[in-house]
From Swiss-Prot:
GO terms for molecular function: structural constituent of ribosome. This is Large ribosomal subunit protein eL20. GO terms for cellular component: cytosolic large ribosomal subunit. HAMAP family: Ribosomal_eL20. Pfam families: Ribosomal_L18A. It comes from the Eukaryota. SUPFAM superfamilies: RplX-like. InterPro entries: Ribosomal_eL20, Ribosomal_eL20_dom, Ribosomal_eL20_eukaryotes. Belongs to the eukaryotic ribosomal protein eL20 family. Gene3D superfamilies: 3.10.20.10. One of its GO terms (biological process) is cytoplasmic translation. The lineage of its organism: Eukaryota, Viridiplantae, Streptophyta, Embryophyta, Tracheophyta.
Length: 178
């Protein structure tokens, strides 16, 4: 559960106080990174793009890792993102089914790398939310909402009926064909 590559961080920062602006505006951002150092770097990257605040004349007030409240229940997650491809910037909405938001984000990064050849630095997560099962749009997520869902049994191994018939070494390989 806790072995995710990306962790969710909340970074709080502001520009340094100046004689004209003694109480600068405080900005809070939730973002995904592999560690705290990269989370801070990403925070300054976005803040420089959004507001006129740079790392050289700014300060980090707090950085906290955000953990899932109940990481044992399965939820549907919606992720709104923007990514840079070879042809330009694109907006996208993705849905994933996972026990944690970090797991869903991990799935998203893996899928974007495999389907679109877009690596981690080129992806900007705009928003994430838990989506109610009635509001899910993607068929890939909807297929798991049915109560009569069945999974095919593709690997059948015949077990011996009693312990007496169990042997360590077999004379022939087992036939697993169904």
């Amino acid at each position: 559960m806790g072995a995710f590559r990306f962790h969710q961080y909340q970074v709080v920062g502001r520009g340094l106080p100046t004689p004209t602006d003694e109480h600068p505006k405080i900005y809070r951002m939730k973002l995904w990174a592999t560690n705290e150092v990269r989370a801070k770097s990403k925070f300054w990257y976005f803040l420089r793009k959004l507001k006129k605040v740079k790392k050289s004349n700014g300060q980090i007030l707090a950085i906290n890792e955000i953990f899932e409240k109940n990481p044992t229940t399965i939820k549907n997650y919606g992720i709104w993102l923007r990514y840079q491809s070879r042809t330009g910037y694109h907006n996208m909405y993705k849905e994933y089914r996972d026990t944690t938001l970090n797991g869903a984000v991990e799935q998203m990064y893996t899928e974007m790398a495999s389907r679109h050849r877009v690596r981690f630095p080129c992806i900007q997560i705009i928003k994430t939310a838990t989506v109610h099962f009635k509001l899910c749009k993607r068929d890939n997520t909807k297929q798991f909402h049915k109560s009569d869902i069945k999974f095919p049994l593709v690997y059948r191994k015949v077990r011996p009926p009693t312990r007496k018939l169990k042997t360590t070494f077999k004379a022939s390989r087992p036939n697993l064909f169904m």
